[in-house]
């Protein structure tokens, strides 16, 4: 009897496997379309995946850039079940993000986001539709408007002063600047999100950083081969990620409830205020009936997670790449410090109103965003209908990936693109706000990063203070060329190794 059961199980397993294999081969054969953009050859089941092997898999934008040199700036890849079109030129960026922006306003939800309970309700991956339009409007008009970002200056001023105090306490010694900057950025984002009265703020920051790191470690294979979702289950990564979210959500539940109780105790009399945090704003909009679609506490948590995921690592990564490039380029460091110290001469404290005319420092920031773009592969889009682009057809449901790294290093656009040359942005109208397709670190069109102004503000003030209050030296007798500039690909593309420097106080 046992043998019959085993035989039945074996036969059933074989039939299921055979049908699965047949379906994959059938899908592969029927995915061939002469009008698709050109791309590398495909094999059954894996598609074009084998062409990425041996091409720096750890940094996939390198591999995609190499393939684009062979197959062109609009390239099709079949990665398992995923049909992917990769754009690698400013011309293709404009064609897609401007001329076809509405048709590709959908954003595919990756497997790692689907693991979490809030998938599809956060700012980054909310599906195109009425709720997306509402959350986009709230982000632009309420959460991250220029006025709102400016109103939060007191948080950045306070936290950047604490950053300087912490560094000054270790002056003359080797410090881990990566940890210092990460703590500053995370605390600014936390205070902007839910105020400064949260007793578990540090715990939530720790959990959010762990969650971003854990999300970056989850395999992307299930996006290409859905049946391989079990990998993250048996590896424990799925459970680990969900446990972090569960623990952090308990803190957010308390924070939201405290905000509601505080509003009730004040009789809802305060209304809009420059010192409202994100939770305050969302609760006010819900209470006053200004929203067409009701926002639940779960939606508020999803927004907060979006702000942390998009606002912490991106800003701290940018600051650290700026400092890294300045340490590698002493003449640029000398020039930018001369500007900062001349403009702020004699000041013992620096406010945001003091740094509005630091033209060269902003050029340094732009050049760092070009050369060391935090998101070298912009968050993908999805075609909601068939498109014709540059004579090729992109079928509906095709994922569209923008290789911004390839564009910001295109020698046809940028002279000496591998070099750090901030002067290229002096008296140059090119900006990062989404209308110059050769420089789109925050994306463009309907899906441009809504927190762009917030992210830039979180870099400018601490950077000005780091350059003003300290002279900087590499440790252990290192020379500029010795500094390791290896990147690590993840949710953002930051330094693989922490940045260790020696600060010496500058007497203004």
UniProtKB/Swiss-Prot annotation:
Q: Which residues bind heme?
A: 449
Looking up PROSITE patterns in the UniProt record yields: CYTOCHROME_P450 (PS00086)
**Needs which cofactor?**
heme
> Organism's domain of life?
Eukaryota
Q: Indicate how the chain sits in the lipid bilayer.
A: Single-pass membrane protein
| Predominant location category | membrane
Q: Identify the pathway.
A: Secondary metabolite biosynthesis; terpenoid biosynthesis
Transport among keywords: no
The EC designation for this entry is 1.14.14.-
Task: Report the locations given in the UniProt record.
Answer: Membrane
Q: Which family does it belong to?
A: Belongs to the cytochrome P450 family.
Per its record, how is this protein called by name? Dihydroniloticin synthase CYP71CD4
Organism annotation: Ailanthus altissima (Tree-of-heaven)
């Amino acid at each position: 009897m046992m043998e019959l059961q085993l035989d039945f199980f074996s036969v059933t397993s074989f039939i299921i496997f055979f049908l699965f294999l047949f379906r994959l081969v059938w899908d592969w054969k029927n995915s061939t379309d002469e009008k698709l953009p050109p791309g590398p050859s495909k094999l059954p089941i894996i598609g074009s995946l084998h062409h990425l092997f041996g091409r720096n898999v750890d940094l996939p934008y390198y591999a995609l850039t190499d393939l684009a040199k062979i197959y062109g700036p609009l390239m099709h890849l079949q990665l398992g079940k995923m049909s992917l079109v990769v754009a690698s030129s400013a011309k293709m960026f404009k064609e897609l993000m401007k001329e076809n922006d509405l048709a590709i306003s959908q954003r595919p939800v990756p497997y790692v986001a689907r693991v979490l309970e809030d998938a599809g309700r956060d700012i980054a991956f909310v599906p195109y539709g009425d709720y997306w339009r509402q959350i986009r409007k709230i982000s632009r008009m309420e959460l991250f408007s220029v006025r709102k970002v400016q109103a939060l200056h007191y948080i950045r001023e306070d936290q950047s002063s604490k950053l300087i105090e912490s560094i000054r306490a270790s002056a003359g010694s080797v410090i881990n600047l990566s940890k210092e900057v990460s703590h500053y950025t995370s605390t600014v984002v936390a205070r902007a999100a839910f105020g400064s009265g949260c007793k578990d703020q540090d715990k939530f920051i720790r959990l959010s950083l762990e969650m971003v790191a854990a999300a970056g470690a989850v395999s992307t294979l299930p996006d290409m081969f859905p049946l391989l979702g079990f990998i993250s289950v048996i590896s424990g990564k799925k459970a680990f990620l969900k446990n972090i979210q569960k623990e952090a959500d308990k803190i957010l539940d308390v924070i939201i409830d405290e905000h509601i109780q505080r509003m009730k105790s004040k009789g809802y009399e305060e209304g809009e205020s420059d010192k409202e945090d994100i939770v305050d704003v969302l609760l006010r909009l819900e209470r006053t009936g200004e929203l067409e679609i009701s926002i639940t506490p779960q939606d508020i948590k999803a927004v907060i997670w979006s702000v942390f995921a998009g606002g912490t690592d991106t800003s701290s990564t940018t600051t650290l790449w700026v400092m890294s490039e300045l340490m590698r380029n002493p003449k640029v460091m000398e020039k930018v410090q001369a500007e900062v110290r001349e403009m702020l001469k004699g000041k013992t404290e620096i406010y945001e109103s003091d740094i509005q005319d630091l033209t060269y420092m902003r050029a340094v920031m732009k050049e760092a965003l070009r050369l060391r773009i935090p998101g070298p592969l912009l968050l993908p889009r999805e075609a909601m209908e068939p498109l014709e682009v540059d004579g090729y057809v992109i079928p509906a449901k095709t994922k569209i990936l923008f290789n911004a790294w390839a564009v910001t290093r295109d020698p046809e656009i940028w002279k000496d693109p591998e070099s750090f040359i901030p002067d290229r942005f002096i008296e140059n109208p090119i900006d990062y706000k989404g209308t110059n397709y050769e420089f789109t670190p925050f994306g463009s069109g309907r899906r441009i990063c809504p927190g762009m102004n917030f992210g830039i503000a979180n870099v400018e003030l601490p950077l000005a203070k780091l350059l003003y209050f300290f002279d900087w030296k590499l440790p252990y007798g290192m020379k500029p060329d010795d500094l390791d500039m290896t990147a690590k690909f993840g949710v953002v593309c930051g330094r693989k190794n922490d940045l260790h420097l020696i600060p010496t106080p500058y007497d203004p």
